């Protein structure tokens, strides 16, 4: 099930096509933080996106459509903010999400790979952090050329701050742009 906003097309641009897959870039506004929600957004996630939009500059959301149907999204934020190992020359991926009815078809790999290749940020490295028991996301990131960076994180507090920790249960992955 998708939770669509009334009119997202004004802020969404087609940026790449490969076969039957299309990658769209969405520029959020304070009132439309996501164009399409594939899951009912939790309050904390909405607040994090709103704070990112208001206080830290803009983030972008990349939507994957396959044969004209939206199947998932990948949020991209500038680096040097929430994830301490990133710099202002980097980007941070996540969350990325594929709707339940489209899982198991390789779309997560497609959206991450296309986002890394076609996103409009000028970046040197891309980072992602993944809970160490999220094997599907680990496999997706590694298949897209991301490697373990070595840093482990804990996600703490209401706003889910990322804190480096030797015993952290999240693994940081890094992709170096070619």
Name what the model sees in each region:
Residues 41-96:
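A conserved beta-strand-loop-helix scaffold within acyl/acetyltransferase catalytic domains
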Residues 95-98, 104-118, 139-143:
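Conserved acetyl-CoA-binding loop-helix of GNAT-fold acetyltransferases
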Residues 119-130:
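Conserved GNAT acetyl-CoA-binding A-motif
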Residues 99, 131:
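Residue-level recognition of the GNAT/N-acetyltransferase active site
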Residues 132-150:
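Conserved active-site alpha-helix within GNAT-family acetyltransferase domains
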Residues 2-3, 147-162:
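Conserved catalytic-core motifs of GNAT/GCN5-like acyltransferases
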Residues 1-47:
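Acyl-donor-binding surface of acyltransferase catalytic domains
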């Amino acid at each position: 099930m998708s939770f669509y906003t009334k009119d997202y097309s004004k802020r969404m641009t087609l940026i790449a096509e490969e076969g039957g897959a299309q990658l769209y870039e969405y520029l959020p506004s304070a009132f439309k933080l996501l164009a399409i929600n594939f899951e009912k957004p939790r309050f904390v996630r909405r607040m994090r996106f709103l704070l990112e939009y208001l206080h830290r500059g803009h983030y972008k959301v990349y939507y994957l459509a396959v044969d004209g149907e939206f199947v998932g999204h990948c949020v991209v934020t500038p680096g040097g903010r929430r994830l301490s190992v990133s710099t202002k020359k980097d980007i941070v991926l996540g969350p990325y999400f594929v709707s339940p009815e489209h899982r198991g078809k390789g779309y997560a790999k497609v959206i991450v790979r296309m986002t890394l290749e076609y996103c409009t940020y000028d970046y040197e490295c891309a980072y992602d952090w993944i809970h160490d028991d999220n094997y599907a996301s680990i496999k997706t990131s590694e298949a897209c050329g991301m490697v373990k960076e070595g840093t482990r994180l804990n996600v703490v507090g209401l706003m889910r701050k990322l804190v480096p920790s030797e015993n952290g249960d999240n693994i940081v992955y890094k992709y170096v742009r070619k």
